[in-house]
Amino acid sequence: MPTPASPSIAGLLLAGGRATRMDGVDKGLQLLDGTPLALHVLRRLAPQVDETLISANRHADRYAELGAPFDARIIADETPDFPGPLAGLLAGMRAARAPLVACSPCDTPYLPVDLVARLRAALDAQQADIAMAVTVDAQQVRSPQPTFALLRTSLADDLAARLAAGDRKVRAWYARHKTVEVEFRDERAFYNANSWQELAALARR
């Protein structure tokens, strides 16, 4: 969607991880049906937001190519040691022109097309700081999905302080703020590739 003068929500693709369970490859650039995983996600995330950011600590030129159709900006962590998704989130919160950031990992090609709208509705209804997706399976088992979230960029300074103190756990930081959980019944929409086996399984779905 075209970016208005004052965008309300920035979309943040988290593609800055180490992918240690995949031999250190750049996970977002791995192919699913001939298309990089990151591009699958961008095609679903970008139409839901007003501006698009890609957190990438490697292969910035390649991500710039993938993000060009969405006018995406490439950003990198402020620290060089791959401290996890919170570092990418902080970089996105500081780079965003919008007051809200919706984040997603780069390896979830079936991302819900209504993800951001549902997170925004819950955030506003509860006057929360963070809205986080939670999947619910057929047995009613709830599984938090902390890297699928909508956050206020005003939390950036607190996040920076926690990272400086050595904190790396996403849900522990969320617990410091008013967080609302948003239930999604379609588990498939949140399937990702943390291993070569899981990437192969995605191709079969």
Where are each of the predicted segments found?
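Nucleotide and nucleotide-moiety/phosphate-recognizing core
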Residues: 2-167, 172-191, 196-201
